[in-house]
Amino acid sequence: MINAGIVGGTGYTGVELLRILVQHPKVKLKVITSRQEAGTGVDELFSSLRGQIALKFSDPAKVDFSKCDVVFFATPNGIAMQQAKALLDSGIKVIDLAADFRIKDVAEWEKWYGMTHAAPELVAEAVYGLPEVNREKIRDARLIANPGCYPTAVQLGFIPLIEAGAVDADHLIADTKSGVSGAGRKAEIHTLYAEASDNFKSYAVPGHRHLPEIRQGLSERSNGPIGLTFVPHLTPMIRGIHATLYARLTRDVDLQTLYENRYANEPFVDVLPAGSHPETRSVRGSNFCRIAVHRPGNGDTAVILSVTDNLVKGAAGQAVQNMNIMYGLPETTGIRHVPLLP
């Protein structure tokens, strides 16, 4: 069994991680932390977990991780970078669901996240946990930088075109939509029911923190810099991401065949039949990314539609997928959930 700990278990990604791990046949949860809820039973705070877990939240200042093989950080940005080194030095593997280790250029990270990085020496070692790209590196990793929700959907949508050199990589466009759970569980005015319901809006158009992460990943697949216009939107739904991606083709290519071949052996990327329009509800509660490809009017513009659940493939599910790879388990162990419909 893999003995696991969770730092920060009261947010949406934390409880999603709990939901997945309590059902995982090869994992035993040893500890879960929360400053505010220390001493409270996990199933008292989250009634959905009644009968599934007997742990209480522990004070992170007093917790002992020595019995853990791996620790997940489901915390705000800036926490994992302060604690990861001590865990790694103790032989404990770390999977960070926040952004602390995603961007290799530390100065760039500090610019976007507005803080000094506490462990720049670990950034180079951290493996970016997108299995469809870095599976072999993930196998041997001690420290995983779990991808962001938008970056997962956007990169999986663009990667086949970028790798094939079939598009103008200087002028990519990602028009993305997310449910309100992507903003986290903290109380904020823009996610109140009266503000978010019956409403639809863009945000962070001048620049979003996920832009450098997406740009970094696609540049690696392109073997050169890429240009990306990234516009996120907040939609009146709880969970889900829909990315509509645009790229100008530079040569004739069979998009359907290209995508089917690229993802033929990927257990969690589903390339839909030609002409399909994926829906966010088709992946709700699952670790799947569903993709459809289009070429309107047989012109020179490729339109790629990519949908994920921001809390699963965009966060907790992908983190467990990475854990499975790190420990030599079948990749789908404990995360091949059928999406919830309706």
UniProtKB/Swiss-Prot annotation:
Pathway: Amino-acid biosynthesis; L-arginine biosynthesis; N(2)-acetyl-L-ornithine from L-glutamate: step 3/4. It is an enzyme of class 1 (oxidoreductase). Its EC number is 1.2.1.38. The keyword Ribonucleoprotein does not apply. PANTHER family: N-ACETYL-GAMMA-GLUTAMYL-PHOSPHATE REDUCTASE, CHLOROPLASTIC-RELATED (PTHR32338:SF10), N-ACETYL-GAMMA-GLUTAMYL-PHOSPHATE REDUCTASE, CHLOROPLASTIC-RELATED-RELATED (PTHR32338). The active site is at 149. This is N-acetyl-gamma-glutamyl-phosphate reductase. It catalyses: N-acetyl-L-glutamate 5-semialdehyde + phosphate + NADP(+) = N-acetyl-L-glutamyl 5-phosphate + NADPH + H(+). InterPro entries: AGPR_AS (IPR023013), AGPR_type-1 (IPR000706), NAD(P)-bd_dom_sf (IPR036291), NAGSA_dehydrogenase (IPR050085), Semialdehyde_DH_NAD-bd (IPR000534). SUPFAM superfamilies: Glyceraldehyde-3-phosphate dehydrogenase-like, C-terminal domain, NAD(P)-binding Rossmann-fold domains. Keywords: Amino-acid biosynthesis, Arginine biosynthesis, Cytoplasm, NADP, Oxidoreductase. It is found in: Cytoplasm. Catalyzes the NADPH-dependent reduction of N-acetyl-5-glutamyl phosphate to yield N-acetyl-L-glutamate 5-semialdehyde. GO terms for biological process: L-arginine biosynthetic process. GO terms for molecular function: N-acetyl-gamma-glutamyl-phosphate reductase activity; NAD binding; NADP+ binding. Pfam families: Semialdhyde_dh, Semialdhyde_dhC_1. Its main location: cytoplasm. Belongs to the NAGSA dehydrogenase family. Type 1 subfamily.
